[in-house]
Amino acid sequence: MPWAALLAGMHATVSPSRVRGRARAPPSKSYTHRALLAAGYADGETVVRDPLVSADTRATARAVELLGGAAARENGDWVVTGFGSRPAIPDAVIDCANSGTTMRLVTAAAALADGTTVLTGDESLRARPHGPLLDALSGLGGTARSTRGNGQAPLVVDGPVSGGSVALPGDVSSQFVTALLMAGAVTETGIETDLTTELKSAPYVDITLDVLDAFGVGASETAAGYRVRGGQAYAPSGAEYAVPGDFSSASYLLAAGALAAADGAAVVVEGMHPSAQGDAAIVDVLERMGADIDWDTESGVITVQRSELSGVEVGVADTPDLLPTIAVLGAAADGTTRITDAEHVRYKETDRVAAMAESLSKLGASVEERPDELVVRGGDTELSGASVDGRGDHRLVMALAVAGLVADGETTIAGSEHVDVSFPDFFEVLAGLGADTDG
């Protein structure tokens, strides 16, 4: 079946398969978002090299344009003309589609404009929380509100903010901190954030600091949160920035190799150089489970072979995007896998804790859902093919496709088109490794 037809049908069928070969993980979605907006904050032209071009990152590029910049695709790169320290007042509503990162980061950028900006998104995004960011921007001198009064989009933002100090929780989304740091660098006085609760997904703020540094912007962690000086200029060396590979996306390929590599063969994933990404922890998780895996950090190549896996306990406070992958690994491993610190994973594109519990149960796994945990008892039952729903969540779709490689019979996943959010050619790459995904 042609790939276009497969995706147009909004479902994918995966049958038991053995995989082998080399693949390249897509560029990092997190880095691409930040690089596009950082280039927007810059004056003049910046080339963002090797970006991820997906539904989510296209939403950020469109937002940069509506704020007065330009973003053109040239030879696989994104050439961005910045709007500088003062975005324009958009002449249309900014539609962030399904991208929470776009909405959070651009909401703070919009608060720099001398006027009103309206942001919205699809049904899933309109159900996600933004209240702490709205309160923070209002506390910094702007006006930011939810039209429904519940902290959810549509959002209306009035600026400009000039900077200051603000308190906000750290356990809802680290993207609030990222948004304030990126915008704060071009305010008059800078922005200091004091976190009132423990920061979840802290490595994503590390990614932000990494990108800011590459663009010549200084920001730092404090005893209570983070601080960025005002009056800074975004100016990357050589007016360009190269995006690293994405460990979140690579996790599905690595899991496929650990569970379904052919005898005597391996799955080799290229483009995986060390970076600030917390999801590089997937390598450690696989090692702890007993996988035969090797990471050559100098060449950026990870090699994994099939082996017997054992259950482990893994906290995902800093790596929420890995929960679906780890849950699938646990379902195919011996013993119990306990995924902890997972309450915030319920507030992604969907409630990933509940969704994975439901889907893995349909496939025959023994799963227990708790408020802050997902417990998967591997080895209790054999996985069997079934029809499961990706719930409009790209990470669920890809994780369940990996489960389909080792389930008995066909696994049909609804909503397969949503891989376009972060890994548009996922099914083509999986087929290139030998997976039977043509139904």
UniProtKB/Swiss-Prot annotation:
<dbReference type="InterPro" id="IPR036968">
    <property type="entry name" value="Enolpyruvate_Tfrase_sf"/>
</dbReference>
<feature type="binding site">
    <location>
        <position position="128"/>
    </location>
    <ligand>
        <name>phosphoenolpyruvate</name>
    </ligand>
</feature>
<feature type="binding site">
    <location>
        <position position="173"/>
    </location>
    <ligand>
        <name>3-phosphoshikimate</name>
    </ligand>
</feature>
<feature type="binding site">
    <location>
        <position position="30"/>
    </location>
    <ligand>
        <name>3-phosphoshikimate</name>
    </ligand>
</feature>
<keyword id="KW-0808">Transferase</keyword>
<dbReference type="Pfam" id="PF00275">
    <property type="entry name" value="EPSP_synthase"/>
</dbReference>
<protein>
    <recommendedName>
        <fullName>3-phosphoshikimate 1-carboxyvinyltransferase</fullName>
        <ecNumber>2.5.1.19</ecNumber>
    </recommendedName>
</protein>
<feature type="binding site">
    <location>
        <position position="352"/>
    </location>
    <ligand>
        <name>phosphoenolpyruvate</name>
    </ligand>
</feature>
<feature type="binding site">
    <location>
        <position position="174"/>
    </location>
    <ligand>
        <name>3-phosphoshikimate</name>
    </ligand>
</feature>
<dbReference type="InterPro" id="IPR006264">
    <property type="entry name" value="EPSP_synthase"/>
</dbReference>
<comment type="pathway">
    <text>Metabolic intermediate biosynthesis; chorismate biosynthesis.</text>
</comment>
<feature type="binding site">
    <location>
        <position position="348"/>
    </location>
    <ligand>
        <name>3-phosphoshikimate</name>
    </ligand>
</feature>
<comment type="function">
    <text>Catalyzes the transfer of the enolpyruvyl moiety of phosphoenolpyruvate (PEP) to the 5-hydroxyl of shikimate-3-phosphate (S3P) to produce enolpyruvyl shikimate-3-phosphate and inorganic phosphate.</text>
</comment>
<keyword id="KW-0028">Amino-acid biosynthesis</keyword>
<dbReference type="GO" id="GO:0005737">
    <property type="term" value="C:cytoplasm"/>
</dbReference>
<feature type="binding site">
    <location>
        <position position="395"/>
    </location>
    <ligand>
        <name>phosphoenolpyruvate</name>
    </ligand>
</feature>
<comment type="subunit">
    <text>Monomer.</text>
</comment>
<comment type="similarity">
    <text>Belongs to the EPSP synthase family.</text>
</comment>
<dbReference type="InterPro" id="IPR013792">
    <property type="entry name" value="RNA3'P_cycl/enolpyr_Trfase_a/b"/>
</dbReference>
<dbReference type="GO" id="GO:0009073">
    <property type="term" value="P:aromatic amino acid family biosynthetic process"/>
</dbReference>
<dbReference type="InterPro" id="IPR001986">
    <property type="entry name" value="Enolpyruvate_Tfrase_dom"/>
</dbReference>
<feature type="binding site">
    <location>
        <position position="175"/>
    </location>
    <ligand>
        <name>phosphoenolpyruvate</name>
    </ligand>
</feature>
<feature type="binding site">
    <location>
        <position position="34"/>
    </location>
    <ligand>
        <name>3-phosphoshikimate</name>
    </ligand>
</feature>
<feature type="active site" description="Proton acceptor">
    <location>
        <position position="321"/>
    </location>
</feature>
<feature type="binding site">
    <location>
        <position position="29"/>
    </location>
    <ligand>
        <name>phosphoenolpyruvate</name>
    </ligand>
</feature>
<dbReference type="GO" id="GO:0008652">
    <property type="term" value="P:amino acid biosynthetic process"/>
</dbReference>
<feature type="binding site">
    <location>
        <position position="29"/>
    </location>
    <ligand>
        <name>3-phosphoshikimate</name>
    </ligand>
</feature>
<dbReference type="InterPro" id="IPR023193">
    <property type="entry name" value="EPSP_synthase_CS"/>
</dbReference>
<feature type="binding site">
    <location>
        <position position="175"/>
    </location>
    <ligand>
        <name>3-phosphoshikimate</name>
    </ligand>
</feature>
<dbReference type="GO" id="GO:0009423">
    <property type="term" value="P:chorismate biosynthetic process"/>
</dbReference>
<feature type="binding site">
    <location>
        <position position="100"/>
    </location>
    <ligand>
        <name>phosphoenolpyruvate</name>
    </ligand>
</feature>
<feature type="binding site">
    <location>
        <position position="201"/>
    </location>
    <ligand>
        <name>3-phosphoshikimate</name>
    </ligand>
</feature>
<keyword id="KW-0963">Cytoplasm</keyword>
<keyword id="KW-0057">Aromatic amino acid biosynthesis</keyword>
<dbReference type="GO" id="GO:0003866">
    <property type="term" value="F:3-phosphoshikimate 1-carboxyvinyltransferase activity"/>
</dbReference>
<feature type="binding site">
    <location>
        <position position="321"/>
    </location>
    <ligand>
        <name>3-phosphoshikimate</name>
    </ligand>
</feature>
